[in-house]
Amino acid sequence: SGLSIPSNIAEGMERFSKKEKIRFLDIARASCAELITQIYIGIKAGFIEKNRGLEIKNEVEEISKILTSLIKGINNANS
């Protein structure tokens, strides 16, 4: 899911229609949620140190917020 975030952003931004752009950005945003879940699992299983995991989770949440803003901006664009 970590790799699918930038991959879906790139693919979406190459699309011509608003609908297609938004679809791929929404998939990227969903991948953020999936990655956050995997981070929590990694912390619980002892594979990720808790403080570092929470730092990464916060960064992923910020990326998700940016994607939400981008989706809203594309939705509101006049073209």
Give the label of every model feature segment.
Residues S1-S79:
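Short, C-terminally biased terminal segments at protein or domain edges
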